[in-house]
From Swiss-Prot:
Gene: PNSB5
Transmembrane annotation, as ranges: 115-135, 136-156
Domain of life of the organism encoding this protein: Eukaryota
Name the UniProt record assigns to this protein: Photosynthetic NDH subunit of subcomplex B 5, chloroplastic
Transit peptide feature range: 1-48
Sorted UniProt keywords: Chloroplast, Membrane, Plastid, Transit peptide, Transmembrane, Transmembrane helix, Transport
Species assigned in the record: Arabidopsis thaliana (Mouse-ear cress)
GO biological process: response to oxidative stress
Length: 212
């Protein structure tokens, strides 16, 4: 069965002659315009998919503080939790038994040595000998007081153990920070305070710690 195709007169482009040359009918021009608009639509979709049509966010050009944290105000920023810094929180320590706490305190104290260790070992035997030979109680109290004073002076003059510094200390330049912490762990507390006492005041300008 044959099919007859009927062409509408309007579907056939008309070409008319004029003194300026041939002219194509408006239907072909419309087809060309549709083709161009289709290419533009594809190009717009491609640009949108690549993210090139997004609006660029405003850049924060305000002055930024030295210790300012992103997205969280300094008053609300929990140091040690959010940044993972070496910070101690007493509430996080699991509380054990009374004798366990005493054992932990004893283990945390370094063993005495030198002259301090000598007077520590002689203290209780000296008190026992004084009571055995019926020494006057005043002498025993004076001896105990002298022992306490000498023992505490020697203990306080020892370098402190590594502990938690303020967050600003960890934000110092690496060389200055390591030197500061090393001096803290090796110097007596009195010499350290004389040398670095102003470091804890972050409101004043300071020279380079590494040169001290």
């Amino acid at each position: 069965m044959a099919t007859v195709t009927i062409l509408s007169p309007k579907s056939i482009p008309k070409v008319t002659d004029s003194k300026f040359g041939a002219r194509v009918s408006d239907q072909i021009v419309n087809v060309v315009k549709c083709g161009k608009s289709g290419r533009r639509l594809k190009l717009a979709k491609l640009v949108s998919a690549a993210g090139l049509s997004q609006i660029e966010p405003d850049i924060n050009e305000d002055p930024i503080g030295q210790f300012e944290t992103n997205s969280i105000e300094m008053e609300d920023f929990k140091y040690g939790y959010y940044d993972g810094a070496h910070t101690y929180y007493e509430g996080e320590v699991q509380k054990g038994t009374f004798w366990g706490a005493i054992a932990d305190d004893i283990a945390a104290v370094d063993q005495t040595n030198g002259f301090q260790g000598l007077i520590s070992c002689m203290f209780l035997p000296a008190i026992a000998l004084g009571m055995y030979f019926d020494a006057p109680g005043e002498y025993l109290f004076i001896g105990a007081a002298l022992f306490t004073v000498v023992f505490c002076i020697i203990e306080m003059d020892k370098p402190d153990q590594p502990h938690n510094f303020e967050p600003q200390i960890y934000k110092l330049e690496r060389g200055a920070r390591d030197k500061l912490i090393n001096d803290y762990n090796t110097m007596s507390i009195w010499d350290f305070n004389d040398k670095y006492g102003d470091v804890w005041d972050f409101t004043i300008e300071k020279d380079d710690i590494a040169t001290r």
